[in-house]
Curated annotation (Swiss-Prot):
Protein name per the record: Diphosphomevalonate decarboxylase
Effect on the protein upon substituting A128V: In POROK7; uncertain significance
Illness: Porokeratosis 7, multiple types: A form of porokeratosis, a disorder of faulty keratinization characterized by one or more atrophic patches surrounded by a distinctive hyperkeratotic ridgelike border called the cornoid lamella. The keratotic lesions can progress to overt cutaneous neoplasms, typically squamous cell carcinomas. Multiple clinical variants of porokeratosis are recognized, including porokeratosis of Mibelli, linear porokeratosis, disseminated superficial actinic porokeratosis, palmoplantar porokeratosis, and punctate porokeratosis.
Record localization: Cytoplasm
Native species: Homo sapiens
Length: 400
């Protein structure tokens, strides 16, 4: 048990982000520098978030970390990189203050606990939210006020995009030291209030090929990936920023789908090939295109990260009808009451015309559940001490 009160205890939350222009591949593995810029949408923390508590105490003999209740190896290189960067920034800040003595917090060890309210390692960008939350929480506990893009990026590249709400660009940068590889907000969460995001959870299983391993293989073997980074992404970044700025949903939706498709094409172009989509993912893709064809307009878009779960973008006036289409194509088993999570959706009947246009044999249980959410803000500080995941002794609180 700790004999002294902790020097500092901070709890924060951070959001998941979903890239609409994908990041895949590093030009520098140690500094986590991407081969192309990317652009993402920050999801609302009311539905998807990571919560992290960091506690500093003179009584701690080593750094320790718990993820979703299980203690993890604090020596993991990316975790160490985040801790090292934050402590370095804290020292620089202290040294710039007219010779202030080194604060005792910098000579102390830190305990960290983090929980996700969504499946970890299932293609739901858990590492992005996790490392963004870690960087943000450590910065608060150590009194660091500088840009945290580099700290979060060293943990997980896309984590730097979770440091902001709304629509966020991760600029690839050109400098060898990565100082210009930073995240920047393109538009705030209030910019497009009608935009909705539906996550169709196909599988919460851990994927066979992790992102880090997959990226490395693609960079080494895929000529399509090199072509994409150099000749396709720059123009798409500019066009996507325009779509967001002008709230041009049909163009936004089409570009989102095309970029997702090209990302997965680079995975297939990798040798040996990588496949993150499964049969249900492909049925969702067909459902989206048939839904749009029925309406004669692009009403819905899909995107897939490195996993089989679909992320759907649409506007609020289309959500109910699209949910009805998904319900028809992938009727829930016994969990009908828990099929829809998140924002409330008004029930809507599926018209006979749309049902005929979908031309799909139902696949019961293909979609486990749907999370309905919207664009949301960046990381938040929780002021209530009851929110801390660690007790006064620096150990995880017992589950309630």
């Amino acid at each position: 048990m700790a004999s002294e009160k902790p020097l500092a205890a901070v709890t924060c939350t951070a959001p998941v982000n979903i890239a609409v222009i994908k990041y895949w591949g590093k030009r520098d593995e140690e500094l986590v520098l991407p081969i192309n810029s990317s652009l993402s949408v920050t999801l609302h923390q009311d539905q998807l978030k990571t919560t992290t508590t960091a506690v500093i105490s003179k009584d701690f003999t080593e750094d320790r970390i718990w993820l979703n209740g299980r203690e993890e190896d604090v020596g993991q290189p990316r975790l160490q990189a985040c801790l090292r960067e934050i402590r370095c920034l804290a020292r620089k800040r202290r040294n710039s203050r007219d010779g202030d003595p080194l604060p005792s917090s910098l000579s102390c060890k830190v305990h960290v606990a983090s929980v996700n309210n969504f499946p970890t390692a299932a293609g739901l960008a858990s590492s992005a939210a996790g490392y963004a939350c870690l960087a943000y929480t450590l910065a608060r506990v150590y009194g660091v006020e500088s840009d945290l893009s580099e700290v979060a990026r060293r943990g997980s590249g896309s984590a730097c995009r979770s440091l902001y709400g709304g629509f966020v660009e991760w600029q690839m940068g050109e400098q060898a030291d990565g100082k210009d590889s930073i995240a920047r907000q393109v538009a705030p969460e209030s910019h497009w209030p009608e935009l909705r995001v539906l996550i169709l959870v196909v599988s919460a299983e851990k994927k066979l090929t992790g992102s880090t391993v997959g990226m490395r293989a693609s960079v080494e073997t895929s000529p399509l990936l090199r072509f994409r980074a150099e000749s396709v992404v720059p123009a798409r970044m500019a066009e996507m920023a325009r779509c967001i700025r002008e709230r041009d949903f049909p163009s936004f939706a089409q570009l989102t789908m095309k970029d997702s498709n090209q990302f997965h094409a680079t995975c297939l172009d990798t040798f040996p090939p990588i496949s993150y989509l499964n049969a249900i993912s492909w049925r969702i893709i067909h459902l989206v295109h048939r839904f749009n064809a029925h309406h004669g307009d692009t009403k819905v878009a899909y995107t897939f990260d490195a996993g089989p779960n679909a992320v759907i973008f649409t506007l609020d006036d289309t959500v109910a009808e699209f949910v009805a289409a998904v319900w028809h194509g992938f009727p829930p088993g016994s969990n009908g009451d828990t099929f829809l999570k998140g924002l409330q959706v008004r029930p809507a009947p599926l018209s006979a015309e749309l049902q005929a246009a979908l031309a799909m044999e139902p696949t019961p249980g293909g979609v486990k559940y749907i999370i309905v959410t919207q664009v949301g803000p960046g990381p938040q500080i929780l002021d209530d001490p009851c929110a801390h995941l660690l007790g006064p002794d620096g150990l995880p609180k017992p589950a309630a």
